[in-house]
């Protein structure tokens, strides 16, 4: 049964993302400050920003997520392993790992499994496997999701946002596969309260967005005059 909209604490779902390639150190600090202000569970950043976030968020209960193989996933396994390990050493407490979609398209299930499982085993931190759902058929989404489950990921992430946004249909599909065993991070094009609520009601447990502040401001504005 879907969570009633007026009972959803939006802030605890929002993973505040700063994945613009030209983001400055000052903007990284602003991202982290917003996470503190709104009590977001995590920030999601490029590997080069992890040390800055670690120092800024020192001893605060906010997860620091680094992307790996982002945004295309077309890196060698050795490169992804190095990038993942370095990110953790620099302070990342979670990793969003872009899958090698060619493995999915070619049905190379064992190669995909081995890559993801090695990252899970090496880093010992929660891994979110990014499916890039806009580029996959439903059959391919199911295959990738099941391989990620077997490999030990903690979340499935719908999208990077670079090749198309997340949809309620995709979240429902992934939730039907996972059945609550792991989390689902919806990401890509989430800009409004209505979008956020619909995705949560579909089964998302995290929402990755650069619009977290605007969403919270919108929620505060409409809270006195709810339309749900």
UniProtKB/Swiss-Prot annotation:
* Swiss-Prot/TrEMBL catalytic activity: 2-deoxy-D-ribose 5-phosphate = D-glyceraldehyde 3-phosphate + acetaldehyde
- Is the Cytoplasm keyword given for this protein? yes
The catalytic activity of this protein is classed by the Enzyme Commission as 4.1.2.4
Question: Which Pfam families has this protein been placed in?
Answer: DeoC
Enzyme class at the top of the EC tree: lyase
Q: InterPro entries per the record?
A: Aldolase_TIM, DeoC, DeoC/FbaB/LacD_aldolase, DeoC_typeI
Report the pathway entry: Carbohydrate degradation; 2-deoxy-D-ribose 1-phosphate degradation; D-glyceraldehyde 3-phosphate and acetaldehyde from 2-deoxy-alpha-D-ribose 1-phosphate: step 2/2
**Active site: which residues?**
96, 157, 185
A GO biological process of this protein is: 2-deoxyribose 1-phosphate catabolic process
| Molecular function GO terms recorded | deoxyribose-phosphate aldolase activity
Going by the UniProt record, its keywords in alphabetical order are: Cytoplasm, Lyase, Schiff base
- List cellular component terms (GO): cytoplasm
Determine the domain of life of the protein's source: Bacteria
State the compartments where it is located.
Answer: Cytoplasm
Q: What does this protein do?
A: Catalyzes a reversible aldol reaction between acetaldehyde and D-glyceraldehyde 3-phosphate to generate 2-deoxy-D-ribose 5-phosphate.
Q: Which family does it belong to?
A: Belongs to the DeoC/FbaB aldolase family. DeoC type 1 subfamily.
- This protein is called Deoxyribose-phosphate aldolase
The organism of origin for this protein: Picosynechococcus sp. (strain ATCC 27264 / PCC 7002 / PR-6)
């Amino acid at each position: 049964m879907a969570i009633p909209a007026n009972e959803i604490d939006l802030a605890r779902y929002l993973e505040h993302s700063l994945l613009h390639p030209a983001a400055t150190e000052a903007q990284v600090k602003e991202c982290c400050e917003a996470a503190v202000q709104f009590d977001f569970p995590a920030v999601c950043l490029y590997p080069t920003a992890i040390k800055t976030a670690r120092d800024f968020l020192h001893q605060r209960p906010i997860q620091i997520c680094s992307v790996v193989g982002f945004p295309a996933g077309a890196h060698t396994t050795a490169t992804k392993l190095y990038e993942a390990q370095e990110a953790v050493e620099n302070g990342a407490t979670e990793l969003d790992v872009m899958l090698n979609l060619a493995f999915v398209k070619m049905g190379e299930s064992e190669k995909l499994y081995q890559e993801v499982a090695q990252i899970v085993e090496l880093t010992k931190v929660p891994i979110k496997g990014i499916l890039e759902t806009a580029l996959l058929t439903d059959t391919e989404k199911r295959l990738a999701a099941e391989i990620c489950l077997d490999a030990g990921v903690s979340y499935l992430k719908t999208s990077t946002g670079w090749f198309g946004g997340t949809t309620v249909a995709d979240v429902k599909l992934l939730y039907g596969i996972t059945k609550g065993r792991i989390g689902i991070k919806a990401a890509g094009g989430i800009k409004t309260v209505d979008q956020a609520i619909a995705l949560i009601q579909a089964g998302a447990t995290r929402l990755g967005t650069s619009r977290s502040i605007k969403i919270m401001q919108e929620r505060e504005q409409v809270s006195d005059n709810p339309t749900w």
